[in-house]
Amino acid sequence: MNIEKVIAREVLDSRGNPTVEAEVFLDSGFSGRAIVPSGASTGTHEALELRDGDGRYGGKGVLRAVQNVNEVLAPALVGLDASEQGAVDAAMLALDGTPNKGRLGGNAILAVSLATARAAANELGVPLYRYLGGSNAKTLPVPMMNVINGGAHADNNVDFQEFMVMPVGAPTFREALRYGAETFHALKKVLAGRGYNTNVGDEGGFAPDLKSNEEALEVLLEAIEKAGYEPGKDIAIALDPATTELYRDGQYHLESEGRSLSTAEMVDFWADWVSRYPIVSIEDGLAEDDWDGWRLLTERLGDRVQLVGDDLFVTNPERLARGIETGVGNAILVKVNQIGTLTESMDAIELAKRSRYGTIISHRSGESEDAFIADLAVATNAGQIKTGSASRSDRIAKYNQLLRIEDGLGDRAVYLGRRALR
C-alpha cells in the first residue's frame, strides 16, 4: 500500500474562493482525493492557511500551497505506506518544521493527509468510516443545523453567528434530518410572514435583518412549533455566537443592540437566555483567550448546558489539555483544518473522550462536495456534527453521506439523541 504519486490542484470552495485539492495514488492502482475547507471566522491559534496574496482571486489564490504539495511533500512521501497515517502525517510535519504549519501551509498538509486516508480505505475496499474507526464505529451524530446565520457568516444586523436546531428527540439520524429540514422550511414561512427576506448565508441558513438577537430565538421557537415539534423535547437550540469576533478592548460589543458587556455581564447574558429558552449548547460563548472568563462561564453553566470550545481549543491537543486542567468548557469542536492533519485531529478527539468532554465534528463556512467529516463523525463515535442547514449542496453532501452510512450499518446504527450532549 505504498504511495506512488501525490498531486495537488487549485479548486474552488462553496464561496467561490480557491482551496487545495490533493490526490494520493498508490502502487496498487488505488487512489484517494480530498478538498480542504476554509473558515470565515478563524481562531488566532489555527494552523496557517497559506494564501498567495497576489492579484489573483483578490489575493486568495492557493498556488503556493499547491506548489508545496507537488514539489516538497510529494517527493518525500513516495514509498511511504499509506496505511501508516501517523507516519505520513509526521513526515509532513517534519518537512514543515513550524508550530503552525506556516512554511508549507496547513491547507497543503491537510489535503494530503485526508487524501492518504481515503486512498488506504479504497485499497482495502472498506468504507472510510470503518477504515478510520474499526468495527465499533456505529454512532450516527446528532446534527446541529445552522438555520439562522449572523455575524461573519451573513451581511445582516444579527451579532451572533449561528442559531442552530438539534433534533435531540428523534429516534434515528434519518428522522433527525427530517425534523431539521421540516423546521427549516417552517422557519422560511415564519420569516416571510414577518416581512423578512429569506436569503441564505454561507452555511445555508437564513440571514434576515431581525429587530434584535433575541428575535432569532423567538422565530426559531415559532418555527419548531409550526413544524409540529415540541421545543426542548423534540428539537433543542444550540448557539455559536462566535464572541471572539465581538471582543475588543476587554468588552463584548453587541453592535445591533448598541451596548458593550464585560465578561461577567456576558456570562449573565448567557445564563439569562439559558433560563428562558431550550438552549442545550453554546459554542465560543466567550473569546478565545478569555480564559478567566471561560472558567467563570463553566462554573456558572457547565452543569446545565454544553459549553463548546472552537476558537478556544482550535482542535489543538495542547490547548485542549490546558482547558481540561483548568476546568474550562466541557466539549470541543473539531475542525480538521484548524490543526492541519488527520492524526492530530484524532488525537484531540481521543483526549476529549478520555476527559469526558463532548465532541462535535464540524465543517467550515467555506466548504465543498467533500464529505470526509461525515465519515469522521461516525468513525470516532463523536455523537454530534455541525455541518450547516438543510440547504446548499455543499452542506447536504455531508447529510446524504450520513444517510448512506446509516443504511450500511443497518440495525447496528446508533443515534444517541439527547444522550450525545455533554
Curated annotation (Swiss-Prot):
It comes from Deinococcus geothermalis (strain DSM 11300 / CIP 105573 / AG-3a). The lineage of its organism: Bacteria, Thermotogati, Deinococcota, Deinococci, Deinococcales. Its cofactor is Mg(2+). InterPro entries: Enolase, Enolase-like_C_sf, Enolase-like_N, Enolase_C, Enolase_CS, Enolase_N. SUPFAM superfamilies: Enolase C-terminal domain-like, Enolase N-terminal domain-like. This is Enolase. Catalyzes the reversible conversion of 2-phosphoglycerate (2-PG) into phosphoenolpyruvate (PEP). It is essential for the degradation of carbohydrates via glycolysis. One of its GO terms (biological process) is glycolytic process. Binds a second Mg(2+) ion via substrate during catalysis. Pfam families: Enolase_C, Enolase_N. SMART domains: Enolase_C, Enolase_N. It is found in: Cytoplasm; Secreted; Cell surface. Its EC number is 4.2.1.11. GO terms for molecular function: magnesium ion binding; phosphopyruvate hydratase activity. Pathway: Carbohydrate degradation; glycolysis; pyruvate from D-glyceraldehyde 3-phosphate: step 4/5. Mg(2+) binds at residues 240, 283, 310. Its main location: cytoplasm. The active site is at residues 203, 335. It is an enzyme of class 4 (lyase).
